[in-house]
């Protein structure tokens, strides 16, 4: 809002305009005027005042029509409108407010009431503009946070011996709580994982950053996936348990040359093992989510990924994606897509399929996929 505020007075009676000018100028407001509805609408669009005093009964275009035009124009900023009229019946007041008026004054104007209404509307205008500025600053900060979070996503390495890896994470908002990482180990194996923090937005993103750092730090000392989760769980519990947060995770150690794969799970979905005949069956690895309780133990399972097979890690944003009819994408639909599609790989195509299925529905959760496959 300007300092001093700019007020537009629209009235077809020169005497009324002069009186309003004198009373408002005495309170150190800048005043501009218009003598009918059409010119008032044009001046409001051009000058975008901080407040409009608008007469209702005017030739060519009455005040209610001017009000509707201004309130329905999305390109204009918020400009509070005080409707000024001799009509004082309740139906007239209702009609004015329904047209978009923010306040109502009846003629003849009481000076004290006029000044009080003007100050009240300008306070609302000031608060509105302040909130708008804060919202713009927050959006800029969130965009910066999005860029920073994208730095956590690792480069996708080129593997040897016919092995390949691909990953994608799409936050539901500017930043999210999903996480994946690909960590090369000295023995030429890879440590990869997909994790999901039990929240969304900025808190989840901050926990995600802490979890990423703790896993990378622990991996320098411990590469057995079960014991690594035990270590990370203990340190994460000290960090987030009081706030009620936790994280689910599936972590895999993969040897590209042989296809050997070891994995452990903390409260997460089992990996999807895609074999020639469909979905492979293997015993589940048990383990609770990270951060809930210290001293937990995690199971380690092992499979051999043969040529033509794939392992798919995913978060709940995949199977819980909703379409415009509030239907969940679901596990069965995901498996059906894989069985009816050519692969490997399947991850990229599955992501596109979910996008088409969702349509114009707003994403309600972060979505992350990581796939390892062999030619």
Where are these regions (language model features)?
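Two-component/phosphorelay signaling modules centered on CheY-like receiver
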Residues: 2, 6, 14-32
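Active-site beta3 strand of CheY-like receiver
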Residues: 47-53
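Receiver (REC) domain active-site loop signature in two-component systems and cognate sites
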Residues: 58, 70
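… and, occasionally, acidic/histidine-rich disordered N-termini of signaling adaptors
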Residues: 132-311, 359-375
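C-terminal catalytic subdomain
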Residues: 250, 301-313, 318-375
């Amino acid at each position: 809002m300007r300092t001093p505020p700019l007020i537009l007075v629209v009235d077809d009676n020169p005497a009324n305009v002069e009186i309003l000018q004198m009373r408002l100028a005495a309170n150190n407001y800048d005043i501009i005027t218009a003598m009918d509805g059409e010119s008032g609408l044009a001046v409001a669009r051009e000058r975008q005042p901080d407040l409009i005093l608008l007469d209702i009964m005017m030739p060519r275009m009455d005040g209610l029509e001017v009000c509707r035009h201004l309130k329905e124009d999305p390109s204009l900023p918020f400009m509070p409108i005080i409707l000024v009229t001799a009509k004082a019946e309740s139906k007239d007041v209702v009609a004015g407010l329904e047209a978009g008026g923010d306040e109502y004054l009846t003629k003849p104007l009481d000076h004290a009431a006029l000044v009080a209404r003007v100050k009240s509307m300008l306070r609302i205008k000031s608060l509105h503009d302040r909130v708008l500025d804060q919202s713009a600053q927050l959006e800029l900060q969130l965009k910066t946070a999005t860029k920073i979070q994208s730095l956590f996503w690792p480069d996708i390495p080129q593997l040897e011996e016919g092995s390949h890896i691909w990953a994608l994470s799409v936050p539901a908002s500017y930043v999210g709580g999903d996480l994946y990482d690909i960590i090369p180990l000295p023995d030429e194996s890879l440590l990869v994982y997909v994790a999901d923090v039990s929240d969304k937005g900025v808190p989840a993103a901050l926990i995600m950053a802490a979890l990423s750092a703790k896993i990378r730090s622990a991996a320098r000392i411990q590469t057995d996936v079960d014991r690594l989760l035990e270590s990370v769980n203990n340190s994460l519990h000290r960090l987030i348990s009081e706030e009620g947060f936790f994280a689910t995770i599936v972590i895999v150690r993969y040897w590209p040359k042989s296809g050997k794969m070891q994995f452990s799970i903390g409260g997460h979905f089992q990996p999807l093992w895609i074999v020639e005949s469909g979905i492979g069956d293997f015993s589940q690895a048990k383990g609770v989510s990270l951060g809930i309780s210290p001293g937990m133990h995690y199971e380690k399972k092992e499979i051999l990924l043969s040529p033509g097979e794939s392992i798919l890690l995913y978060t709940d944003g995949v199977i819980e994606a909703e379409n415009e009819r509030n239907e969940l994408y679901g596990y069965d639909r995901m498996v059906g897509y894989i069985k009816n599609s050519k692969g490997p790989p399947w991850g990229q195509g599955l992501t596109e399929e979910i996008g088409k299925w969702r349509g114009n529905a707003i994403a309600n959760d972060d979505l992350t996929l990581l796939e390892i496959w062999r030619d």
